[in-house]
């Protein structure tokens, strides 16, 4: 069994009173970089606004966060480097990230012209530009891309149930990988491409699972009493970081 370490945080956002802030109270978002060797966390940005979902840039020089539907670049020292150009896609949510080769950015975003809540998946050049829509159906939330860059995996609501699906980065057939009742979410490929890690509520508590890349042979990886979400596998394929709610 692959070892899962819940205490490791590569980058994190802590937020105070994010949802439905009462009148007179403020939303405070904080961005940290945590050094795994020293165990020290460095606060690089704290502001009175809602921002979230930091992702390392392919060259490691900045972090990409989202705020109010836009994607912003923040240097590792906390300097604001401006918005990333995402063309007409201007209502991004917190599900975005880069391909393994660093050439492509995947974005999940609503369409303002559709009144009900939506989320579609797009791809765009890592340096920005006009995105191309991948998934035709909503709601679809991007979470991972295969190491060879050919397929994306994502969480999608189909027939009032959230499961994990796979599709070519160029669009096409939607392949269902999970079919359990309740939420299956957060799919991410292992660096060797053999496994997809997910978090699933199939046991009654959100836990980390992994399955073969074709969705077969699901295997539970965490067994504690706490809800565990979003496994991110280290490049060495030996450890993972997860979010645990205690």
Q: Which positions does each model-derived feature cover?
A:
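Hydrophobic alpha-helical segments
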Residues: 16-17, 49, 113
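Asp/Glu-centered strand-loop micro-motifs enriched in Gly/Pro and often flanked by an aromatic residue
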Residues: 42-48
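Beta-propeller blade-edge and WD-like acidic-aromatic loop motif
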Residues: 23-42, 62, 66-86, 101-104, ...
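Residues at the start of alpha-helices and the adjacent loop-to-helix junctions
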Residues: 4-11, 46, 88, 141, ...
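Bacterial Sec-dependent N-terminal signal peptides
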Residues: 1-21
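Conserved beta-propeller blade repeats
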Residues: 48-64, 90-105, 137-155, 181-199, ...
